[in-house]
């Protein structure tokens, strides 16, 4: 899925085997791409390739996917616009590298969250976990089931929402089993 889009942008890989080495090309062009299936990986690969592309890249997703790459580009001050399932990016931006703090991965924490909720007399505190709205559907569902969830210390790090999740055995546990 990724390499086909990059070839469309005139990027060539070395041997077509992992790890893929991408050779530079000074004549990259932006593309307009309507994604047939939602894929954050394909979208991010196109956006990263578009950093050096001349012109505008427009990506249309059938469904919005996670937006960490777009938020990072925004934090870097790059010319990116996000409007629903459409992403517009003007290539050939100059930017300075910055230090990033990467929040804890919510999808990895999901197993621990459910375990704490269904295990009698248990609790867990997950600090500095990412609370990006594109990643926390599980939390919303569990809250609607009256699960014992507290979100503390909510803040932004760069463009990402993070916080500390305190979870403990819930009466909703019977509904989860």
Regions from the PLM with identified roles:
Residues 40-44, 48, 107-108:
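Secondary-structure capping and domain/repeat boundary segments
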Residues 60-75:
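Aromatic- and glycine-enriched pocket-lining scaffold segments that form the walls
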Residues 50, 73, 115-116:
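Conserved short beta-strand element of beta-propeller blades
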Residues 30-37, 55-64, 98-102, 124-129:
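Flexible, glycine/proline-enriched loop segments at strand-loop-helix junctions
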Residues 109, 114-150:
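A conserved active-site cap/scaffold subdomain adjacent to cofactor or substrate pockets
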Residues 12-35, 52, 78-106, 117-118, ...:
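Self-splicing inteins and homing endonuclease
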Residues 1-7, 11, 168-177:
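Single conserved hydrophobic/aromatic residue that forms the stacking wall/gate
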């Amino acid at each position: 899925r990724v390499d086909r889009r990059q070839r469309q942008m005139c990027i060539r890989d070395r041997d077509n085997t992992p790890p893929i080495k991408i050779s530079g090309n000074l004549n990259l062009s932006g593309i307009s791409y309507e994604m047939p299936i939602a894929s954050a990986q394909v979208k991010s690969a196109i956006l990263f390739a578009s950093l050096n592309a001349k012109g505008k890249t427009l990506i249309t997703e059938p469904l919005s996917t996670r937006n960490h790459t777009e938020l990072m580009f925004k934090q870097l001050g790059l010319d990116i616009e996000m409007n629903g399932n459409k992403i517009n990016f003007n290539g050939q931006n100059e930017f300075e590298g910055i230090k990033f703090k990467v929040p804890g991965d919510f999808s990895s924490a999901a197993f621990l969250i459910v375990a704490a909720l269904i295990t009698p007399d248990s609790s867990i505190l997950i600090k500095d976990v990412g609370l990006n709205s594109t990643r926390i559907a599980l939390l919303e569902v569990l809250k609607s089931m009256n699960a014992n969830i507290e979100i503390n210390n909510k803040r932004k790090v760069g463009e990402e929402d993070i916080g500390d999740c305190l979870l403990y055995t819930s009466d909703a546990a019977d509904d989860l089993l």
